[in-house]
Amino acid sequence: MSPGLLETNDYPTALRTFEWKALWELVDGTAERLNLAHECVDRHPPEAVALRIQKADGGREIHTFGALAAWSSRFAHWLEAQGVARGDRVAIMLDPSLAFYGALFGAVRRGAIAVPLFTLFGPDGLALRIDDCSPKILLVDREAERRQAEFPAVRVLAVDGSFEAALAEQPAEYAPATAADDLAVFQYTSGTTRALPEAVR
């Protein structure tokens, strides 16, 4: 019987006694039913701090796990209402914020694939990634009309006051139905050594 992963204090022991099946000790889910949004967000006390965000203008934001769980659950409900199915890609081109992390975990909660995109990508870099992942929805902070013209096959939405109001009408809890082998995130590499950056899945 190997020691629990959280009870091992040194690397040699952890390496010697490691078993893949022991990883299931660390999560609530099973191979048949596992959701990363639940594991990363819902398991924490709702009043505990989840996000500390330093803004470019010097401002700061602090958000709890409860707020993150509610935002992501409402977004998952909204995605379902918009016809976003399991395996569909949802591109998220937002500055660090509750909306960014809420959308990321909300897409995962729904069973869609979250695709975080850097807000300072130029036209060519963004087009390469959009063409590669073929998202059903692209969330942006601003310039939604221009992005829509650039990518007519993608539904482009600005996360603004009206969008937040629409989310507020959705329930604050969502029961995910995903498995351990479902894809959750496409994270594009920097692409410095190849024309098209590779999506780590």
Question: Locations of the language-model features?
Answer:
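N-lobe entry segment of adenylate-forming
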Residues: 1-63, 67-80, 153, 177
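Structural core segment of the AMP-binding/adenylate-forming
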Residues: 3, 81, 105-168, 173-178
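Conserved AMP-binding/adenylate-forming core of the ANL superfamily
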Residues: 47, 51-105, 122-127, 201
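Conserved pre-ATP/AMP-binding loop-to-beta segment of ANL
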Residues: 47-49, 158, 170-195
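Short coil/turn motifs that cap or connect alpha-helices
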Residues: 64, 85, 113, 195-196
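Surface-exposed loop/turn positions
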Residues: 88, 112, 181-182
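Conserved S/T- and glycine-rich ATP-binding loop of Class I adenylate-forming
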Residues: 90, 107, 138, 183, ...
